[in-house]
């Protein structure tokens, strides 16, 4: 038997049927799916050095299980004391099984470790069916060693779906188990 991540198995066995039932799709191909998860972490340029960049890349790589890359600034910005070609952020794009494994760890391990957690914001959709989740501290992931962590950066996690409507994407992420805020738990 082949290995299948838990959210992927859940999607194939239960979520597709629930989405077809709720939105009356005529074909299985119309059912929205999670295409990719993009994790982006901005780096403070004022404390920039190669060691900071390498530590941040190693941390994101440990969290996601996939090598992260850094993004360079495209032009000089004197207001930010930024030179062209300076690394300003780190990103990693997750697809297929690695994406589902990260989603499982995020929902079941990392988000419950957030202090005073009541759910994620349900209004962070972009109008095209994509959801953005901001995390202020990376130490919620158990892969991060807090003793050796010098700079604690936050990150932005973008869930890209094949849906063009926020309502469908929200229901898809809800069925995956993403805990949205409700009036009861606020």
UniProtKB/Swiss-Prot annotation:
Presence of keyword Membrane: no
Record-linked Gene3D superfamilies: 3.30.1440.10
SUPFAM superfamilies with a match to the protein in the record: RL5-like
Gene Ontology biological-process entries: translation
MF annotations from Gene Ontology: rRNA binding; structural constituent of ribosome; tRNA binding
Entry keyword set: Ribonucleoprotein, Ribosomal protein, RNA-binding, rRNA-binding, tRNA-binding
Recorded GO CC terms: ribonucleoprotein complex; ribosome
Family matches, as Pfam families: Ribosomal_L5, Ribosomal_L5_C
PANTHER family: 60S RIBOSOMAL PROTEIN L11-RELATED
Family (UniProt): Belongs to the universal ribosomal protein uL5 family.
Oligomer status and interactors: Part of the 50S ribosomal subunit; part of the 5S rRNA/L5/L18/L25 subcomplex. Contacts the 5S rRNA and the P site tRNA. Forms a bridge to the 30S subunit in the 70S ribosome.
Function: This is one of the proteins that bind and probably mediate the attachment of the 5S RNA into the large ribosomal subunit, where it forms part of the central protuberance. In the 70S ribosome it contacts protein S13 of the 30S subunit (bridge B1b), connecting the 2 subunits; this bridge is implicated in subunit movement. Contacts the P site tRNA; the 5S rRNA and some of its associated proteins might help stabilize positioning of ribosome-bound tRNAs.
Name this polypeptide is given: Large ribosomal subunit protein uL5
